[in-house]
Amino acid sequence: MGKITSIEVQKRNVNRVNVYVDEAFTFACDAELIYKQGIQKDSLIDVEEIKEIVKEDEFIKCKNSALRTVEKTYKTEKELRDKLTEKGFEEDTIKRAIEFLKEYNLLNDEKYAEMYIKDRLRSQGRNKIKYALIRKGVSEDILLDKLSNIDSEDENYTAFKLAEKKYNILKKKESDKYKLSQKLFRFLLSKGYNYDCCNSIVRRLTNNEYME
């Protein structure tokens, strides 16, 4: 048990304070914890109380870091977890911060998937979108649900318009129809469209059945 002899606001960050116990610097924490924990000069404090304050301070730092991260750009839970891990926060602290953001709907993989799919469908097929979301940690259940809502006709139309634009560029450089077909087919595959869609569009544009 020690006696708090001084509480000083940090010069470089007025939102944080340095706490001295028995005239020696003991810990620093967020200023709001001083009020929440009832910390004041001349009060007594033991090691367990200090540990609890430091733990809560880590949570506040982690939470604020998480808030800044999602404020810049929306993230999946996995992306945010990875970011916070890189910054050195402990797993238990990260878990609390993530639950806090979920509570206020600032972290929602279902919402993220909807937004991502809507944006990427302008230039990509469902396969590329699917694997990108898998890498971002979106669950299989969410993926199956959201990808099933994609309108195949709209997707095929977008694929055709992309292929048409690419075809007009390629035909100026490639006179060999077979090679042109190959390049166009690979282009569509790289965009995430399925084999049947790619083959149908290539044949339509080149009047030539694609052959691998």
From Swiss-Prot:
The keyword Ribonucleoprotein does not apply. The keyword Cytoplasm applies. Pfam families: RecX_HTH1, RecX_HTH2, RecX_HTH3. It comes from the Bacteria. GO terms for cellular component: cytoplasm. It is found in: Cytoplasm. Signal peptide: none annotated. GO terms for biological process: regulation of DNA repair. Keywords: Cytoplasm. Belongs to the RecX family. HAMAP family: RecX. Modulates RecA activity. This is Regulatory protein RecX. It comes from Clostridium perfringens (strain SM101 / Type A).
